[in-house]
Every structure is written in C-alpha cells, then in structure tokens.
Amino acid sequence: MLTVWERPKRWSGYTLGVDTAEGLGHGDYSCVQVIDVKEGKQVAIWHGRIPPDELAYEVYNIGVWYGNALCCVESNNHGLTTIVQLRQLGYPNMFRKRSLNNESNKMTQEFGWKTTRTSKPLMIDDLGMALKNEELILHCRDTIGELRTFTRNERGSMSGSPYDDRVMALAMANQMRKYAFIPEFVQKVDDTFTFDWWRRQIPSNDPENNHIGTNSFRGTA
C-alpha cells in the first residue's frame, strides 16, 4: 500500500530506498521509502507483501512519479530479481557501484546496495547521525516504531523486532542523498513513439498534478 505525505515538486530531487522480501503471505514485507533530498522529508512510503518481480513495477511508477528519483535496491537475495526487472523496464536512474577489477584491470559495475558486515553498520550509523542531527523529517508512525525496536547485539548484529524493512529502506534512501542531486531544469519527455502519448501530453508539463502511474513508460517502443 502506498502512503503519500507530499506530492512531487518540479524543482525537488528525491531518493528511493527499496528493501525486498520474497512476497509470501506469512513472510517479511517489502518496503519503498521516498525522501526529499534537500529537505530530508519522508514524502512517501510503499509497504506490503508482493513478489520481487512485481515490486519492480511499483518502484518504477513511484520513481518516475517523483521525477526519476535515484533508486537504490538492496541487492541481496530477492533484490536481484527486482533490480533485473527494473533494468528491463528501463528505469533511468538506478544506483550502481563502480569498482576496478584488479585481475582484468577493467571497471565493473554492480547495481543496488549489497548489505554486508561492513556496509550495513555504515548505512545504519549514517541514518543514526541524520536522525540525531535532525536532518530527516519522518511522518510514518510505523517507521518510527521500527526505529525504536532496532538494536545492535553484543556480536554487532543489527535488526528490529519483529520487522525492520522500513528501517532498512529508510537507511538506503538516506544513503542515496550523498549521490543524488537537485535538478536545475526539468527535462521534457519525448512522447512521439509511445502508445499513450495523448494521455500524457497534458499532465507532463505539471508533475505536481500527476497521478501515480501516469508517467509509466512500460509501453515505450
């Protein structure tokens, strides 16, 4: 289910943090957090149980609605399925990490955020600092509730009880604020070769009045 506190603004930049799950009726939840880069506002959240490939469509529509927001999907486990589907849909602004392969001496890239023993503490510590310094404005009570139960044990393992999907998605969205930018101009979309160009001509000039899914490009030839 999608909850929106603030609709997209033309001159604002946004980030998406995506925590994925298997999508079973009795399992963990998937979550998408949307943050305003400049103001640190939590502007929207999607939360529910859905297969990872279908989650990609939700992420795509939310991301496009928020001006092609910088999207970061956790690449562990089921997240790879979501990433592959997003790439097939042609989402234009996915986070990717570039690194130099010492053996081939070539640059390689990996889409998404891989949560490891090293990267998870970094991400959570950055989130903690942002909250402590009041850089983030949260509206979701359930997100705040998960933050209150999120702990680190003696072995250094971090988790929430019973769930922490909202926290992890928020941490990724906050991490992306380092790499996102606030647009200096709004690029117009060429609708010439899309099957639904006529439906998108009017709202395309005013994204604040767009309804979610209006700018879906799944029909692009």
Located regions from the model:
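RNase H-like, metal-dependent nuclease domains and their acidic two-metal-ion catalytic environment used
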Residues: M1-R98, N105-Q109, P121, D125, ...
